[in-house]
């Protein structure tokens, strides 16, 4: 059904023809950092996705998808489902997830009134913005952000090879595993085993993670389409999106969270602040319907 939605009022007609021809799908996975999916055969999963696509396209009369499988960032989806985001690891065993709301939003009004213990004034915009801090516990045995960059890259390679490419039918480029690689410049690799056999045998002494990742990316350039690479930062700042906490702090905070009843939140008026939406800066959206 998704591939059949090709009537784009805001794009040139050529794009409708392109989307009808390729009928692309984006069947993604998220929560991979919990480790459960790693037990299963991704090639079989991709095969089943192709079979279902073939069955449905025969019934709907559209083209079969040129590319079916992907791994998206899944930031919002992971919050709704309570999972790790896309291919990425969990932040830690226990942490706070901080969300920001305009104080005039109905959900913010409800939380500030009924659950003030979850709310803090934003230190940068205390007059109009509230931070809501939610305690999170990663499932037992989950992959955590403390893993090495090579561990993350090898997981990207595994999904790219067995899930993405297995779901590719035609086209010059495959879909991608969306991933941000955090590199710790203080982490050293001392032997070939440490860096999954990537250290040049002619180099002497340890390599830092930037060097090892650069070498991995070159030698495995067929295993990804694009990657974001950022320095790992183990510090914190006030009201960061993710902040480590202890198990004791988690247990203290989760009691309040269990008492939430969001069915009491009703939106009477449109309180969207278009000034905080990039595409609608200045109060006028770029895309008009």
Where do the PLM segments sit?
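Nucleotide/phosphate-binding sheet-loop regions of phosphoryl- and nucleotidyl-transfer enzymes
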Residues: 25-30
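Internal maturation/activation junctions in enzymes
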Residues: 6-14, 31-73
